[in-house]
Amino acid sequence: MRRLVLSAVVLLVAESLGAQAPIKTIEDGALDKIQLFVASIDQPADVMVVIKPFDASGADLGTGGKDGKEARQQEAATMKNEGPRVLAERFVATLEKGPFKGVRALKAEEAVPDGALVVEGKFVTIDPGSRAKRYFAGFGAGKSSVKVTGSVKDATGRTLATFEQRRIGTMGMGGGDSLGKLMSDAKSIGEDIGKFLARWARRESLD
């Protein structure tokens, strides 16, 4: 009897894990990595999309960490505060013309509207890089980077897709403005995610 119970538990766990397996994985396409758990979004014209503020609290700050220069730490701290906002704003702007019924950014504690698709995620990396290396070593050295991971869920909390996206900035021989590039990259990532969602909803290629 005990063996039968254990077998049943193992079977249930296996079925549960199988149900979570993506039906398709796409790398270096619309985003760096996309895992789809459903083939498409049904009737997007009737669907509201919301984006929650991406969590930046656990991001790897690179040269903006506690051992970095004060200027880099300040840039990283500013990005932790402002990055989620500018990402969400660009995401919303990208989808305002469709194909969804509507799109808006939620505040941190705001409730999700009934029936809405939810985009949420976190900043994995917010690295200002090294301005000195960019200045003296030139192209490719001391590059800054911003990376996020996230998911798209339906109103019941079921995961429809997961994604990863990273933007890297070198800024050339002059060294460049690390904070300006980080903010620009956060906006670009918001746009990238919005375009991915639009292409997926329109059943266009994500490769």
Regions found by a protein language model. Give the residues of each.
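Short secondary-structure boundary motifs at beta->alpha junctions and helix caps
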Residues: 70-78, 141, 153-203
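N-terminal signal peptide c-region/cleavage motif recognized by signal peptidases
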Residues: 14-16
